[in-house]
Amino acid sequence: RPSFCNLPVKPGPCSGFFSAFYYSQKTNKCHSFTYSGCRGNGNRFRTIEECRRTCVG
């Protein structure tokens, strides 16, 4: 899996509310979170399918 999958979830400090998904190394699963729209990182996906395809297994 790409190294960015291991980055911590980072919602960011802005005021937007965007549904996103991140990979958790601890659970080896993708989970939903609310992204603020800025200053996130590479461990952020638009769909759970994209997250799973990139980071799980």
Swiss-Prot record:
Q: Which Gene3D superfamilies does UniProt cross-reference here?
A: Pancreatic trypsin inhibitor Kunitz domain
UniProt-listed CDD domains: Kunitz_dendrotoxin
Looking up InterPro entries in the UniProt record yields: Kunitz_BPTI, Kunitz_BPTI_sf, Prtase_inh_Kunz-CS, TFPI/VKTCI-like
How is this protein annotated for GO cellular component? extracellular space
Q: Which cysteines are joined by disulfide bonds?
A: 5-55, 14-38, 30-51
SMART domains linked? KU (SM00131)
Residue ranges of every copy of the BPTI/Kunitz inhibitor domain listed in the record: 5-55
Q: Which domain of life is it from?
A: Eukaryota
Q: Where in the cell does this protein reside?
A: Secreted
GO molecular function terms noted in the UniProt entry: serine-type endopeptidase inhibitor activity; toxin activity
Q: In which tissues is it expressed?
A: Expressed by the venom gland.
- A Pfam family of the record is Kunitz_BPTI
Q: Mind listing the UniProt keywords for this protein, alphabetically?
A: Disulfide bond, G-protein coupled receptor impairing toxin, Secreted, Toxin
What is this protein's function per UniProt?
Interacts with vasopressin V2 receptor (V2R/AVPR2), probably in a selective manner. Inhibits vasopressin binding human V2R in the nanomolar range (Ki=3.50 nM), and also potently inhibits vasopressin-induced cAMP production (IC(50)=21 nM). In vivo, intraperitoneal injection of this protein into rats increases diuresis by 6-fold, without any loss of electrolytes.
> What family is it from?
Belongs to the venom Kunitz-type family.
Q: What does the record's free text say on domains?
A: Exploits its two major loops and engages more positions in its interaction with V2R. The pharmacophore defined by numerous amino acids positioned in loop 1 (9 to 18) and loop 2 (34, 39 and 44) may be at the origin of the absolute selectivity of this protein for V2R.
**What protein name applies here?**
Mambaquaretin-5
Which species?
Answer: Dendroaspis jamesoni kaimosae
Organism taxonomic ancestry: Eukaryota, Metazoa, Chordata, Craniata, Vertebrata
